[in-house]
């Protein structure tokens, strides 16, 4: 639900009030509580918890299939994270020497939404310090694509996304004569 959320505060952390008034929320944010929103949020959390295991399994399978297809086409493709320890909904891949910004444009024209670099450096106009810190070269950072999988993804659209990524990377390799 809109206008409701959860803030988990570590013991020992002191927060300052940002809205003053009636003293609701332990004096940290006064105003009438959105009871219906809170109940809706609690229900959403319960549903997410019940579905989490199956969703993790589903997303892991989709990500593994996508990686398998891409690796088959590009054995030199770099995966920038430990596939066993990273979030199953997240994938950062790199095609050294390819301009990932051009890939983003080509893929968006086909309905595949991806981003470049790391989320920590998004829209900063500089190379990702996160990818540099894990040892990627400038060419690998410049060729990095970030993909996020979610509840709307399925076998069919992940397969098509993989095909479009392969086409786009091949087109860029041909353009740059690699």
Question: Where in the sequence are the language-model features?
Answer:
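Active-site PLP attachment segment
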Residues: 1-26, 30-43
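Structural signature of PLP-dependent enzymes
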Residues: 45-68, 78-87, 99
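Conserved C-terminal alpha-helix-loop-beta "cap" of PLP-dependent enzymes
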Residues: 89-145
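PLP-dependent enzyme catalytic core of the Aspartate aminotransferase-like
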Residues: 122, 126-178
């Amino acid at each position: 639900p809109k206008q409701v959320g959860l803030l988990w505060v570590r013991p020992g952390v002191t927060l300052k009030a940002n809205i003053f008034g009636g003293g609701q929320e332990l004096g940290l944010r006064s105003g009438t509580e959105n009871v219906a929103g809170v109940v809706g949020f609690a229900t959403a959390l319960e549903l997410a918890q019940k579905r989490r295991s199956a969703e993790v399994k589903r997303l892991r399978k989709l990500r593994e299939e996508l990686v398998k297809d891409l690796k088959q086409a590009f054995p030199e493709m770099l995966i920038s994270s430990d596939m066993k320890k990273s979030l199953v909904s997240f994938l950062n891949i790199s095609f050294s020497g390819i301009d990932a910004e051009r890939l983003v444009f080509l893929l968006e024209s086909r309905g595949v939404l991806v981003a470049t670099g790391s989320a920590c450096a998004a829209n900063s106009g500089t190379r990702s310090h996160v990818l540099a810190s894990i040892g990627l070269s400038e060419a690998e950072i410049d060729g990095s694509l970030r993909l996020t999988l979610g509840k709307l993804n399925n076998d069919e659209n992940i397969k098509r996304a993989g095909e479009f990524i392969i086409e786009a990377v091949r087109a860029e390799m041909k353009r740059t004569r690699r």
